[in-house]
Regions:
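A structural boundary/capping signal
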Residues: 1-140
Length: 140
């Protein structure tokens, strides 16, 4: 199936079935027509398998502390920072692509993570932890 058709099918489907990792790699495949999207998805699987602690903090420690992912402070606006395959290769990216890596590694570990858009930033939150905190606040 054509990359554009595959992307269109993905975003037309139910929201809860719209996988961010697949969408990001399909976008990257437009820049690199030889990109094997399924191979790229397996790279995220491998990152998840290497994570010893299945928590948001554990994923962040693994990706940023052990594997060496970091923000690209030298050439922040370069388009390669928006291509998930290149971010995996370089272990450098912008907040939104790094957040996609965190969320998708977390999803593979059974975590319920979500992206949070902020002015000039993109953050990741653990839905379970926030829900538990909100419940405690209501009970106290």
């Amino acid at each position: 199936m054509d990359i554009t058709d595959r992307f269109a099918d993905l975003v037309r489907g139910p929201e809860d079935e719209c996988r961010i990792d697949l969408g990001a790699f399909l976008i990257a495949a437009h820049a690199n027509r030889g990109l094997d999207v399924d191979d790229q998805l397996h790279r995220l699987d491998d990152l998840a398998m290497g994570c010893p602690t299945p928590t948001l903090d554990g994923v962040c420690e693994h990706l940023f502390g052990v594997v060496g992912f970091q923000g690209d402070t030298e050439d922040y606006k370069h388009p390669r920072n928006s291509l998930l395959d290149v971010v995996l290769d370089r272990r450098r990216g912008i907040p939104i692509t790094l957040a996609v890596v965190v969320m998708e590694v977390g999803r593979r570990l059974g975590l319920d993570l979500a992206g949070v858009g902020m002015p000039g930033h993109f953050l990741v939150r653990d839905r379970d932890r926030i829900a538990a905190t909100a419940m405690r606040a209501k009970l106290n």
